């Protein structure tokens, strides 16, 4: 089992790092008391090999030896990787002023500045023990995400899940679509008597549509459009992209185009899914 511990000063980006880990398949727990780690890992045994835990100052031991004792209780086969995120006092002050959130150490007689400085002193011994120390003072959330991903994977590239979905306009447009293409202008197999009861997954319909120059040109142009912009979408920290293809009833043209695009992109590095919404109505 691989365990990633994320600690650091409040406001430095721990929640951002945890979201990256969640996208990478980690079972994530926010602000778990260290004494509960052993129990959590025992419960997750056989269910998840990737676990990430964020710990804030309220759950951290006051001495290094206490932390070492807690980690020593974990199963021997646990691979531990640790992060410490930090920012300058001025940056943290600005972030808290903008969000107007309450600092974990804020009390009636303690100012925000004093709470930030106190947290830094309390966490300083822990900061010296971690595998990766990240100063987020000059990083935005995308740059921090890339940095965490690069440490874990050796690359900033993100596995983008591309979901191609066919649908029929007569049943309504999918609300989750990022891109939507209308293929009702393409030659319609519905008007061929022998093709009408079939779908775009059946060979006779595929042969009919593959012989239409307009269909082939449309698929080629959509492929080029997506190939051009996918790298930019990935750098924008997207986890998935839904591309909807619609025709009148969602039986022939949209199903065929969706199927062909899914096959084309399956040859690349992306994880591709294909779904035919209206075929489930049968």
Curated annotation (Swiss-Prot):
SUPFAM superfamilies linked: P-loop containing nucleoside triphosphate hydrolases (SSF52540)
Record keyword Lipoprotein present: no
Keyword Mitochondrion: no
Domain of life, source organism: Bacteria
InterPro entries tied to this protein: P-loop_NTPase, RapZ-like, RapZ-like_N, RapZ_C
Binding site for ATP: 8-15
Keywords: ATP-binding, GTP-binding, Nucleotide-binding
NCBIfam families xrefs: PRK05416.1
Similarity comment text for this entry: Belongs to the RapZ-like family.
Protein name: Nucleotide-binding protein Shew_3314
């Amino acid at each position: 089992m691989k365990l990633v511990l994320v600690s650091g000063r409040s406001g430095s980006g721990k929640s951002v790092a945890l979201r990256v880990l969640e996208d990478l398949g980690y079972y994530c727990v926010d602000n778990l008391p260290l004494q509960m780690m052993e129990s959590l890992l025992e419960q997750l045994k056989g269910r998840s090999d990737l676990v990430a835990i964020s710990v804030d100052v309220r759950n951290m031991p006051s001495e290094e030896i206490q932390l070492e004792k807690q980690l020593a209780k974990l199963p021997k086969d646990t691979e531990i990787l640790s992060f410490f995120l930090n920012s300058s006092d001025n940056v943290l002050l600005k972030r808290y002023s903008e969000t107007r959130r309450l600092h974990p150490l804020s009390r009636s007689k303690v100012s925000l500045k004093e709470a930030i400085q106190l947290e830094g002193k309390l966490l300083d011994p822990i900061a010296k023990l971690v595998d990766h120390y990240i100063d987020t003072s000059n990083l935005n959330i995308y740059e921090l995400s890339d940095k965490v991903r690069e440490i874990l994977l050796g690359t900033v590239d993100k596995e983008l899940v591309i979901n191609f979905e066919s649908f029929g306009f007569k049943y309504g447009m999918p609300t989750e679509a990022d891109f939507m293409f209308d293929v009702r202008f393409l030659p319609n197999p519905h008007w061929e008597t022998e093709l009408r009861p079939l779908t775009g997954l059946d060979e006779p319909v595929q042969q009919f549509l593959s012989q239409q120059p307009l269909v082939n040109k449309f698929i080629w142009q959509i492929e080029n459009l997506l190939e051009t912009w996918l790298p930019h979408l990935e750098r924008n920290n997207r986890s998935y992209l839904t591309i909807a293809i619609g025709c009148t009833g969602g039986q022939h043209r949209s199903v065929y185009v969706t199927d062909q695009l899914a096959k084309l992109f399956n040859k690349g590095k992306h994880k591709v899914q294909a779904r035919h919404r209206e075929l489930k109505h049968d």
